[in-house]
Amino acid sequence: METLSNASGTFAIRLLKILCQDNPSHNVFCSPVSISSALAMVLLGAKGNTATQMAQALSLNTEEDIHRAFQSLLTEVNKAGTQYLLRTANRLFGEKTCQFLSTFKESCLQFYHAELKELSFIRAAEESRKHINTWVSKKTEGKIEELLPGSSIDAETRLVLVNAIYFKGKWNEPFDETYTREMPFKINQEEQRPVQMMYQEATFKLAHVGEVRAQLLELPYARKELSLLVLLPDDGVELSTVEKSLTFEKLTAWTKPDCMKSTEVEVLLPKFKLQEDYDMESVLRHLGIVDAFQQGKADLSAMSAERDLCLSKFVHKSFVEVNEEGTEAAAASSCFVVAECCMESGPRFCADHPFLFFIRHNRANSILFCGRFSSP
């Protein structure tokens, strides 16, 4: 699973960078692990250049048993008896006249806990759209209701990849609501907006990353199975500078025990709620996945004997809310320890300007969610 962890982490940071570039001043939020597992499900049915492009974009070696690794990861992430609620749901919806292969359908169930649902896009496009939206709403406890907007499905649609994820976690150290107060959030040097800023002073893992001039804070959820990592540039450092130099290898190095040390720290973190949606086709083209979306070029012959089958639509919509109680969501470097700095009142982590954040499954070392908070 370590190979997959590195591959999915690399994919996560590449994906985050593309979304940040496309919207330089906007908020960003997505679930890279659910996107990569959904794509790997399509990879099961892909051959030739289509499969090569997808494997390369996902940083995967097709020779390895990647599907079994995804099976282990999804089982670990979705396991029962945790202190957090996390539900991932992938499903392919295919035109019923396409005659999908039973071997492909069985593999989807075995490795991805996902079934291929056959619908009649040709005869009942709008009913099919509503069916898909209802399924997603149910899987995300009503947080994501209109995944596919009106007229996004038509009689030409053949294959829709749907990817839903829902997360709700409580902090290991909750914030006290009585300390939450309005404070200015500096969007840039000219503009600021008010936010509800949470506050607590407690012991957390903290580091200062000299390479990018930023602080890195880890806020664990209950039982410390998952953590929120917040990467906050120093005052005067542009977040885009941090984004450009960020890699998964660096993030992994910065979060190692010799880099992050437990220290008493004042934490100021804004309450926020984000809901973002992305048409993944344009994003994935940036990553080199081109053929899968093109009729006549896509080779999905391990999925169906239909010659012109291609991926018609892949939409990713995600929701996150961070508050005093916790989070509700539905998507080799130099560093030194802040505790060693000479600060009279102890370290202070004040997230009153744009930052990157990651929700990590600690045991699997997997980035479940990542995003950028730029503006309230």
From Swiss-Prot:
UniProt cross-references to Pfam families, sorted A to Z: Serpin
GO aspect biological process, one term: immune response
UniProt keyword Zinc, yes or no: no
Matches recorded under PROSITE patterns: SERPIN
Compartment(s) where it occurs, according to its Swiss-Prot or TrEMBL record: Cytoplasm
Keywords on record: Acetylation, Cytoplasm, Protease inhibitor, Serine protease inhibitor
GO molecular function: cysteine-type endopeptidase inhibitor activity involved in apoptotic process; protease binding; serine-type endopeptidase inhibitor activity
Gene Ontology CC entries for this record: collagen-containing extracellular matrix; cytoplasm; cytosol; extracellular exosome; extracellular space; Golgi apparatus; membrane; nucleoplasm
Residues with PTM N-acetylmethionine: 1
InterPro entries reported for this sequence: Serpin_B9/Maspin, Serpin_CS, Serpin_dom, Serpin_fam, Serpin_sf, Serpin_sf_1, Serpin_sf_2
Site positions per UniProt: Reactive bond: 340-341
Family: Belongs to the serpin family. Ov-serpin subfamily.
Record function comment: Granzyme B inhibitor.
Name under which the protein is recorded: Serpin B9
Organism of this sequence: Homo sapiens
Lineage: Eukaryota, Metazoa, Chordata, Craniata, Vertebrata
